[in-house]
């Protein structure tokens, strides 16, 4: 029996998902605890609630996955800023701040809250995270061939 924790935070609604033996078993949005609509902070309360509910320990957790690759995002924001620096500065500077204070500190949060081994922190491709979410919530497409088309603003630089 192994558990995988999925975490989304720092940009949109923060949330935590728990997968047990490849099946999504639970999901919580941080706003359920903070009562702040669209809360983007690290979902500490949701994470602690689910860890307690399922009695999760380091030995039971196979991985803790973040929904993007922060260093890839960093390089994309940098390239984006260089193309039109004066027009993009306001957007890029706020994204850099979010990235620096958020995504890059993901493993610090999991270590502090879960006492999780560093090698259990994984970073998923952003658009793959969207696609897997679609599969998890639509039982009609389970175990079938499928094409999932993700349209997103920036993601991992794979945007059309």
Task: Go through the PLM ranges and name each one.
Residues 1-160:
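Short acidic/glycine-rich loops and adjacent helix/strand connectors
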